[in-house]
């Protein structure tokens, strides 16, 4: 019988053919565009974390809410929670100290300095994939233990801040003196889509350290925070783990001393859990049944909790006082001889063969066991460089305490950006180089000063292209992930930024602006650089027949070279900046994907990216002065010509060579080459979503809207690092 007959029979009996079971017809189900075209451009990355997903609304002010928080009472509640053991997840030795330290560590430990993504700044541990990573087993329980406290204090404390504060309080409760705590992490309400966790399709796929150097991700295996605790690819070899440890900790900006301090400090308290084989462990939170209510890894072994708990599969307790701070980690590491053994779950670990039974059992006070260590713990003894640091910490516990306090603070605050973003009563006074410190303001330019400065810039002989280009070069280093970079500080005038190929315009323009700054002495160089962009855009808009005042907020300062970590700032150098038609390497993704990546780092929406590219092309801001994408006969005029000519069917585009990176636009009738373009230009005509946006600005009635939209997006970029205005 035909499908038509089936449908007819269904209708004749009064039944709806769409309610008869079979295929999933719910929203979002079925074969999607990316199933057909897996390399489809991810324009959707520019739409994440919008107000549509935020239940608190766009008027919510976290800093204002936090100011209402009884901070002391909150810390008191956290301290009480540490020893309030719950039967559904009993605390080891009656304390959740180790669990909460691990929760905070694993929240912050996803940060990587190469692109500033990951980290604890958004509370992403609540969402997939992190909530279900193999390395985060049982942290769902830690978050549930915190829920009554989050419920009590509501929006006065974000989940993101609470996770880290809980780790700090756990350390303090163990007798350790922390370096401080800065709040200010605002929650988001959906998973980050922009973080590249790697290409692997299976959990715990091994990555060689050399591969990590080429693609500096945060871990040596998919689903781990750092390294495999059993050694690379379960090798069980402490020495072979050294390269992996350096690679992963180095990728988040940690040196050898910080690395040793963090590993030892983190393993001074608590334990690992491996009561039985992983086959007893159920589905992770994302795959668990609906009745599990977001909890995962249910264990069928014994009670499944307490002494029967299975987390990593390792069963290690490092110190004699696992709920109190000590130097026992280093004492045990060097005092005893270690032999390889296996946990009850079969995982490779080491036991102190010549040690007495001095380690307390977490649930039976009458029992003791020998000290145990992870494979990667022993790396700190057998790697020559790590060993020197470890012995120093063994002999100088105060040096260890100081190193761990600072390294822990760095670990948990590295992705927060400048100190200006920190709030709360425990923010340390000391400025740290990794915070990209800035001096106090020297200038407070008046409105009259600004008017005079604009006139001086306009009379300086700089072109519109030069003025706009230098402002973009200064501001566009900003990264939304870790809030680094931006125009404040005028680091464009310092090493390493002044020497970047993409910033070639700085060599021509900065001497002019620096001379002007010294002559007038009314504003910082940082403000003058941004003001130059204002002058250039206002001139370009006027040339297009639109009178507009570009908003400008003074108050930027000029950083010193000694306040600038050259190595860390080198990571901000773009491998591509499609807004300036710049690309340094052809072996990393596609040009158009890198444009999306750059726009996402600048927190731009797809319309904002579109209008900025179109405007910057007609203003002639290509890094090398090329004519690629300059689809206009009147450069320097803020017109919609880029869009109108890109979408004009009079022109046919063809690649100039097999690389498919450069293209010529020829007149279909004459064959004459009219324009040249890169992939960062043509994508606005080829991608269906971006073409739809380009069509808006190509319409005959779009000119004034285009100028206003361009100015709004431009000002947004210029002020991305103005946390004093937010």
Swiss-Prot record:
Organism from which the protein derives: Salmonella choleraesuis (strain SC-B67)
Entry EC no(s): 1.11.1.21
Cofactor binding, note field: Binds 1 heme b (iron(II)-protoporphyrin IX) group per dimer.
Cross-link (Tryptophyl-tyrosyl-methioninium (Trp-Tyr) (with M-252)): 105-226
UniProt-listed CDD domains: catalase_peroxidase_2 (cd08200)
Entry protein name: Catalase-peroxidase
A biological process from GO: hydrogen peroxide catabolic process
Active-site annotation: 106 (proton acceptor)
